[in-house]
Regions:
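DNA polymerase processivity clamps
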Residues: 1-209
Length: 209
């Protein structure tokens, strides 16, 4: 079975990853230090490691990114079945983009009683969208840092996905020109999206590993 590397080079690539943005979750070990992406046949495989063991999350790449998808995850042997909509993650961007002076705060996501709550050091917001199915309680802590370099797949898919879904919801389209401004490794990378109605922008911090 051939494995090919997924290059994060277009807005479509970001949207493809966005549906698994909330899946970097571990019930017992929420902080994941590294992440990588690969495509095997029709499956997008995300591999994340912590200090104890490798965590493998696999989900299917769907052609229609505008519809709500059912995603099944198996994290540390813990199965969770979530019904995710782009609206469920849109407020995460507002919490993230409120960061001052180029810092990238921890972004905490809690799902409780069918609702998702998102908070960061910069802002605290809540999302009150109900899930169609029961959602088990857990808290996810997205990593603080991201690996940044030209064409590097080490970019944190969770934070990229949050930005992409937010932009998708904001305009209701998946073909808008999102620009990912690459810079030298070890330096922050900026992304931006501009339309007649305004602009969104964000910052991806380099890995400290």
């Amino acid at each position: 079975m051939e494995t090919t590397t997924t290059l994060i080079s277009t807005y479509a690539d970001l949207l493809r990853i966005s549906k698994v943005a909330a899946l970097f979750v571990s019930k017992d070990k929420p902080h994941l230090s590294q992440a990588s992406l690969a495509v095997v046949e029709n499956n997008l495989t995300l591999s994340a490691t912590d200090s104890y063991q490798a965590i493998i999350i696999t989900t299917t790449i769907f052609a229609d990114l505008s519809v709500t998808e059912r995603v099944t995850t198996d994290v540390n042997g813990y199965d969770s079945h979530l019904v995710l909509s782009p609206k469920d993650m849109v407020l995460a961007l507002s919490a993230h983009k409120g960061t001052a002076k180029g810092t990238n705060p921890e972004l905490r996501v809690t799902i409780d009683d069918g609702k998702i709550w998102i908070a960061s050091e910069a802002a605290t917001n809540s999302l009150d969208y109900d899930y169609r199915d029961h959602v088990p309680n857990y808290t996810a802590l997205l990593p603080k840092s991201d690996s940044v370099s030209e064409g590097n797949v080490g970019l944190n898919p969770a934070l990229l996905g949050i930005a992409a879904t937010a932009c998708e919801v904001w305009r209701g389209k998946s073909d808008l020109p999102m620009i990912l401004h690459h810079v030298a490794p070890g330096r922050p990378a900026h992304w931006s999206l501009t339309t007649d109605e305004g602009s969104l922008n964000g910052l991806l911090m380099p890995s400290r590993l």
